[in-house]
Every structure is written in structure tokens, then in C-alpha cells.
């Protein structure tokens, strides 16, 4: 997904403030929830007849005490500038940008079936040793792998899946036949 300049400006501003008040993760969760609320009640939030203060109050009521003044101000700014259609993009981009700001690394792990907590911990420790950063693992299931995993991080791909090994063997056999 390509993120707009508008989204990145809002994300960078919220990250800067979040870092100062040590709430980067909290704001990420709030943005995710805001995105869910926005998508569910899009017609209400996009209605120009509804005043900004009413939209913000609705969000404050739905979030209860979990929302702080900084985040309320952020939401107000988004609605005042009529940028609410960017909320899903802002939420998605914030997630990835916050990983970088916190000096973590995104790790995509594709497996044939869901990994156990021990397997995830082993992958996490392996990645941490390789790049000396805390990994944030995103799991994806692809039954065509048969077994094993494909691990991607820092532009590297480690394929320890059965289908990957079978493909490698097939390439070697075909190269022998041609040679």
C-alpha cells in the first residue's frame, strides 16, 4: 500500500508527540480503534452537516477513559481539516512507522499452519541475533508450503519450507538435464 503525504504528516506528528509522552503503542491501539469506529460509522463521520465537535464527542464517548487529551486534539485536527477519509491510511502507516521509530523490525513469517508460542519465540530470538533489533512478527498462513516457514526481514528471505526445498531440488534437476 502506498501512503499519502497527508497521512504521513499526521503519522509523523502523532509519533513525535507519542514518543515525548511515551505512548507510541497506546496511540497505535487508539488509531486502530478509531479506524474501526470510522469505518463502521463512515456515513456519520463524513456527513458535512454534522459538526466537528459532535464527531469528536462521539469518539470520546465510544472510547471512554482510554483516550487522552493529546489524542482527542489529534482527532479534532483530523476532522477540522476534513481529513477523516485518511484515517484508515493513517492507522496502517502509523503501525509501520512506529516499528521503525521504536527501533524494532518487521518480520513476515509465512507457514503452512499456525506456529506455537515456542516456535514464535525461537524465530524472534533468531531475528534478534541477526539484526540486534526487537522483531515484530506478522504471521501469514499458506498451506501450499506443506511444512516449514518462510521468514522475511531486512530485505532477506529465509525459506525453510518443504515446498521451497522441493522447488530447489526441481531447479537443480532441470539444470543438470540442460547441462
From Swiss-Prot:
Keyword RNA-binding listed: no
Main location: membrane
GO cellular component: plasma membrane; proton-transporting ATP synthase complex
GO MF terms held by the record: proton-transporting ATP synthase activity, rotational mechanism
Entry membrane topology: Peripheral membrane protein
Protein origin, superkingdom: Bacteria
Subcellular location: Cell inner membrane
Entry keywords, A to Z: ATP synthesis, Cell inner membrane, Cell membrane, CF(1), Hydrogen ion transport, Ion transport, Membrane, Transport
Gene3D superfamilies: N-terminal domain of the delta subunit of the F1F0-ATP synthase
Database matches in HAMAP family: ATP_synth_delta_bact (MF_01416)
NCBIfam families according to UniProt: ATP_synt_delta (TIGR01145), PRK13441.1 (NF009976)
Entry's family note: Belongs to the ATPase delta chain family.
Role played: F(1)F(0) ATP synthase produces ATP from ADP in the presence of a proton or sodium gradient. F-type ATPases consist of two structural domains, F(1) containing the extramembraneous catalytic core and F(0) containing the membrane proton channel, linked together by a central stalk and a peripheral stalk. During catalysis, ATP synthesis in the catalytic domain of F(1) is coupled via a rotary mechanism of the central stalk subunits to proton translocation.
Description of how the protein assembles with itself and partners: F-type ATPases have 2 components, F(1) - the catalytic core - and F(0) - the membrane proton channel. F(1) has five subunits: alpha(3), beta(3), gamma(1), delta(1), epsilon(1). F(0) has three main subunits: a(1), b(2) and c(10-14). The alpha and beta chains form an alternating ring which encloses part of the gamma chain. F(1) is attached to F(0) by a central stalk formed by the gamma and epsilon chains, while a peripheral stalk is formed by the delta and b chains.
Protein name as annotated: ATP synthase subunit delta
